[in-house]
Structures are given as structure tokens and as C-alpha cells.
């Protein structure tokens, strides 16, 4: 490339960070990273006449270049070191020049999107990515570019140092700044950066809850509990960003106090990994960016769980299972937006790929910390009955092969309403032969972060969560919106029974014009089946608009054979097994645009079923064909 400021590996340079991939996790990560890089390279804009986009990575979904696409520079350099192929360094330089033109700011920050007034907090992620590049692959840069990068990183460090406090944005930002400042301080030899990085890391420890071990602070108010005593917790951001950055801080600083706190918290969050590697963030405050494999724009869980695998053998399995799932979700070199995104014809946002490529690059650069993994099980692989997490008012249920989640979590994200489900909702029903059967989405799909989410243009779109609802007077009333709902669990050797009480309320917790409508929803789990019972107060809707009903979206990808046996039962073939659904009331299939509805949260399709009566019992069984 004309004017390139990057050079090949110098004579005698030894890049010791790339391991020989002795374990499946590292072999798979290396393979997947190359696939993702190929996908990203194919989308890089090399037409210099496209001035604004030249050098950036084009997003097929958003028809634009995302402001954080420069995060791919770090993976490109890693692959340049591994393969000795100059195409990666050429692409990295071109991408850096795009960053410099389009998102770099005079105050040292980088914009989240190439738009005036865009969020600057993501500067910390760009700074970490470029500092890792300089630290691990500086030998691939010629002196002039290396010095240019050092100067630019110093400006970014000053921005972070001067602006970030423990209450800057959501908690993932100051936690990331703890590692970012320490790393910049080490790479650039700026002692004050390291001092503030340590202060932020230790201040962040008080955000790890004493009861359950969750990281709180994903939304405000930081310090004021909800009515049920809950604080703001988001599984996706915790496992894919905050805990990885605290891990990196602890390892670089040799800070055992931080590493012990992180280890405890990782064990708590590990409870929510499904056996297939999916993250059950059906309840999180920021689950508007939840995809089944993680979160749309965060980095990935591999950094924390792989690099601390020596502390708990199950950590290695967490990282491995999730990486396997990432591979399954990768098509044509890009990580798709959920298991059913492609089957529903959803274009792939490139953000998933360049963000998650950083986690794989990080563990590959650090080398395999666990050469001989000890066999271990994930918590949800075991049939343990019921576990309650009071921090989030959520139950995890495990009976036979069924895995379920029921939540009454009452902390919403900032001032937004109708985000994650509550009300005693069944937010996850999973079976090893079929994967997810019932899954919660947002109560109302809203673009809380429009630049980081995809618009839903389907006129038949709806929430995926099983629920009771009533549309009347231009408002939507649902039991899954009720933040005051109660949940009781009965755990016996033969069965698990969950009884919930809630009301039909709108997003502001108000009753419909007809008055208070009480709902009673129960879930029964045995080794053989799952039974769901719905009931709500009968009302005289004659003077009201619309009719209440029970809505039951059954997760099913386009192409899965479905047969209605009669008006009260159906059978479906999923992954070589058969699901039988039966009800004591007629089932009505609601309109769709092509046989299925799709929800970006968490990237799944479903067949929407409706029951008009105010009482219904549904039974689900799964068996091999």
C-alpha cells in the first residue's frame, strides 16, 4: 500500500503469544477468528471515491460504517503476526485512517458513531483495543506509525483520566476504564493513569453484590434499590464486558483481591449459561441488546472465563460452549444476530463480529492457560430443583431435562418502561433435545440505543414472552409488565411448581379502564413434561375496546415441520425430536408475515398462538423420534 506505515515481522521477532492451540477452545477460537477476519476484510471499503467510508468496514444491515469498526485493528494485527500476511496490516492501517478522519476528536475521544454529538464513552474500548495492538504487536509497526499511535493513545488516556469516574455512564464504563488506564499507563509509562486505574478497580468492587455476587450498576440510580430491593443488573454486559475488563486489570496488576472478587462473581453469572452455551439474559436491565449467544456490541465472555480457567474447571467449559455457539451462529464470515436471524431473512450487522473478535484475540494473545482442561459440568447441566437469586428476584428451575427461568425482577433500565419481562413471567424454557422452547423478549421492542440496534419493520411483530394481554383504549396491558407480582415455588422430589400472581397493567403500572384484573399463572415441571396454567379475572368487555387473551409464542425456526393435530394440539419436529403441545382450549394461530414472527431479542422466531378464554392449561412434552 502506498504510504503504508506498517512493516512485516522483523528478523528475530518472536511472537510468543500465539499458542499451538492444544485445547479445543483455542483451536476453535483461532479458526473462528480467521473466518471473521475474512468476513470483515470482504466488507472493507477500498474505493477511495467514497470519501466518508473509505477504509471503514461496511455494515450490510445498517448500510453504514459503524464508529467502533476500528476495534478490528487489533484482530487484524494478531493475524498478521500469526500468518505473516501483509493484507492484514494493510487493512489495519486503512481502517485506522478511517478512524482518524471520521470519529477522532480534538479532545482525545473517539465518537461511538461518525455523527456530531455521538457518545464518547466508548473511547475506552477503542483505547484498550489499540493499546493491546501496540503492546502485543508493536514490532509489526514502523517507528513513525508506532509513535503516531503512542501520541494518539496518550490523548485518549487523558480524556479517560479527566472524564471517567465510578459514576460515568453505566458501570461497564468505569470498570473498563480501570483496565484501560492501567494498560495505557504501562504501555505509555504514565504513572497517574495506573494510579487512577487501580482506584477505579477497587471502587468497582463495591458494585459486586454481597448477597448473590452480581455486578450492579447497569442503569441508574446506582445506589437506590427498587421496591423489591433490586439494583440494576445485566447479564450480557457483565459477562461480556465488565468481568472481562476486571479480569484483565487483575491479571496485569497482579491484584489478587480483585481476581478473587471476579472469580466469585463469575461463578454467579455462570449459573445463567444454558447447556448449549447460550446466555440466559431474559431478565437483564439492558437485554434490549441480548442475543442468544451474548450481547450485540460487547466483546465476549471468553476473556474472563478462559484466562481464569485454572481457578475453576467449569470456567473453561463456559468459554468453550459459548465459542461453539458463536461458530454455529457464523455464516459467510459474520456472526449473525441470533439462531434464527438468517432463516427469517434478517441482514447481519457487522458490529457483532468485530466486537466479539476482540475477546478471541485476547485469549489467543495470552496463550492457553489450561493445557489439560479438567472435565466439568455447567450448573444448568444438573437437575438441581430450584435456585433463587434475590438480587434480581429470579428463579432458575431444573427438573429432568427441562430448564426454566421465572422472574419478578422490578428494576427497569433508567427511565425506560416495558423493557425486560417481569410479572412472574416464564422467560426461558429449554430442553437439550430442542434448545429453547419458550423465551422472553422485551415487553415492547424499543430502540433504546438506535445506533446499536436494528429496526423492526414487521407489522405483525410482538413480544415472544408467554403472557396475558389486553389492548384497549390505545394502550397495552400485560401481566408481564407488573412489577409488583409475587412468585411462590414448591420444590419436591417429583415436581417443581411455580405459582405467580400479577395484574394486567400498562407500562406505567396502571390498571385498564375496566379496573383491576388479577392474573394467576402457574408452571409445573416434572421429568416428563411442563404444564402451564393461565387464568385472569373474567370481565365484561362489552363496553370496552378489544378482548383480553392468552398469547403463547412457541419458538420455532422457519422450515421446522409443524402439524396441527386438531384445534387444541400440535406437533413439531425440532432437531430430530418431536415436541407435542396440547391445550384444554382452542388454539388460534395469529397472523405472521411468513409463517413465523421474529424478535431481535434474542434473535429467535416463533409461531404465535392465542387463546380467547380466560382460563387455559397447556402441556409440553418432548421425545425422540
What are these regions (language model features)?
Residues 576-579:
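Short, low-order "capping/linker" segments at domain edges
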Residues 5, 10, 134-137, 185, ...:
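A generic secondary-structure signal for well-formed alpha-helical elements
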Residues 582-625:
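Beta-strand-rich recognition/accessory modules
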Residues 27-56, 90-109, 147-167, 192-219, ...:
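Long, well-ordered core segments of solenoidal/helical folds
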Residues 61-81, 85-259, 286-294:
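Aromatic-lined, polymer-binding surfaces characteristic
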Residues 18-26:
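N-terminal low-complexity, Pro/Thr/Ser-rich intrinsically disordered segments
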Residues 1-17:
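N-terminal export signals
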Residues 256-260, 270-549, 553-572:
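Extended polysaccharide-engagement surfaces of secreted carbohydrate-active enzymes
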Amino acid at each position: 500500500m502506498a504510504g503504508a506505515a506498517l512493516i512485516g515481522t522483523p528478523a528475530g521477532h518472536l511472537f510468543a503469544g500465539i499458542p499451538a492451540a492444544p485445547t479445543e477452545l483455542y483451536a476453535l477460537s483461532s479458526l473462528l477468528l480467521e473466518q471473521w477476519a475474512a468476513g470483515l476484510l470482504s466488507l472493507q471499503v477500498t474505493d477511495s471515491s467514497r470519501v466518508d467510508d473509505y477504509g471503514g468496514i461496511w455494515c450490510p444491515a445498517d448500510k453504514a460504517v459503524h464508529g467502533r469498526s476500528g476495534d478490528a485493528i487489533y484482530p487484524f494485527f494478531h493475524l498478521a503476526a500469526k500468518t505473516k500476511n501483509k493484507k492484514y496490516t494493510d487493512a489495519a492501517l486503512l481502517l485506522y485512517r478511517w478512524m482518524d478522519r471520521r470519529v477522532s476528536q480534538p479532545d482525545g475521544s473517539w465518537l461511538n458513531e461518525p455523527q456530531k454529538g455521538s457518545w464518547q464513552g466508548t473511547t475506552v474500548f477503542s483505547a484498550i483495543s489499540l493499546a493491546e495492538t501496540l503492546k502485543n504487536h508493536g514490532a509489526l509497526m514502523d517507528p513513525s506509525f508506532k509513535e503516531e499511535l503512542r501520541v494518539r493513545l496518550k490523548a485518549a488516556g487523558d480524556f479517560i483520566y479527566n472524564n471517567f469516574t465510578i459514576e460515568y455512564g453505566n458501570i461497564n464504563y468505569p470498570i473498563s476504564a480501570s483496565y484501560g488506564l492501567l494498560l495505557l499507563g504501562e504501555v505509555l509509562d504514565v504513572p497517574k493513569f495506573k494510579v487512577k486505574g487501580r482506584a477505579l478497580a477497587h471502587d468497582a468492587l463495591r458494585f459486586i453484590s454481597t448477597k448473590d455476587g452480581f455486578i450492579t450498576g447497569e442503569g441508574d440510580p446506582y445506589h437506590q434499590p427498587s421496591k423489591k430491593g433490586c439494583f440494576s443488573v445485566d447479564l450480557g454486559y457483565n459477562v461480556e464486558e465488565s468481568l472481562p475488563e476486571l479480569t484483565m486489570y487483575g491479571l496485569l496488576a497482579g491484584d489478587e483481591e480483585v481476581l478473587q472478587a471476579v472469580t466469585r462473581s463469575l461463578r454467579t453469572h455462570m449459573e445463567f449459561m444454558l447447556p448449549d452455551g447460550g446466555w440466559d439474559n431474559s431478565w437483564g436491565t439492558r437485554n434490549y441488546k441480548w442475543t442468544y449467544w451474548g450481547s450485540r456490541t460487547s466483546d465476549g465472555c471468553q476473556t474472563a472465563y478462559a484466562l481464569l480457567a485454572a481457578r475453576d474447571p467449569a470456567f473453561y467449559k463456559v468459554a468453550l460452549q459459548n465459542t461453539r455457539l458463536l461458530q454455529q451462529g457464523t455464516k459467510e464470515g459474520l456472526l449473525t444476530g441470533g439462531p434464527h436471524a438468517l432463516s427469517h431473512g434478517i441482514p447481519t450487522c457487522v458490529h457483532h463480529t468485530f466486537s466479539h473478535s476482540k475477546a478471541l484475540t485476547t485469549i489467543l494473545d495470552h496463550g492457553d492457560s489450561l493445557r489439560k482442561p479438567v472435565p466439568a459440568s455447567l450448573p444448568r447441566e444438573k437437575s438441581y430443583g430450584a435456585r433463587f437469586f434475590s438480587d434480581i428476584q429470579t428463579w432458575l428451575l431444573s427438573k429432568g431435562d427441562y430448564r426454566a427461568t421465572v422472574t419478578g425482577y422490578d428494576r427497569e433500565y433508567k427511565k425506560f418502561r416495558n423493557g425486560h419481562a417481569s410479572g412472574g413471567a416464564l422467560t426461558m424454557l429449554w430442553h437439550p433435545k430442542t434448545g429453547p422452547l419458550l423465551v422472553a423478549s422485551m415487553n415492547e421492542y424499543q430502540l433504546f440505543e438506535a445506533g446499536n440496534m436494528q429496526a423492526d419493520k414487521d407489522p405483525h411483530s410482538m413480544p415472544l414472552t408467554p403472557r396475558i394481554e389486553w389492548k384497549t383504549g390505545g394502550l397495552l396491558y400485560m401481566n408481564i409488565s407488573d412489577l409488583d407480582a409475587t412468585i411462590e415455588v414448591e420444590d419436591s422430589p417429583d415436581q417443581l411448581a411455580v405459582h405467580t400472581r400479577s395484574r394486567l397493567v400498562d407500562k406505567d403500572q396502571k390498571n385498564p379502564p375496566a379496573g383491576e384484573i388479577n392474573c394467576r399463572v402457574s408452571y409445573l415441571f416434572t421429568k416428563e413434561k411442563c404444564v402451564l396454567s393461565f387464568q385472569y379475572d373474567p370481565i365484561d368487555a362489552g363496553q370496552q375496546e378489544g378482548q383480553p387473551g392468552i398469547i403463547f409464542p412457541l419458538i420455532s425456526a422457519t422450515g421446522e415441520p409443524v402439524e396441527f393435530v386438531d384445534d387444541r394440539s400440535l406437533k413439531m419436529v425440532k432437531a430430530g425430536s418431536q415436541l407435542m403441545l396440547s391445550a384444554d382450549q382452542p388454539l388460534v394461530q395469529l397472523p405472521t408475515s411468513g409463517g413465523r414472527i421474529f424478535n431481535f431479542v434474542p434473535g429467535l422466531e416463533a409461531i404465535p398462538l392465542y387463546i380467547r378464554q380466560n382460563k387455559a392449561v397447556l402441556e409440553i412434552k418432548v421425545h425422540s423420534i
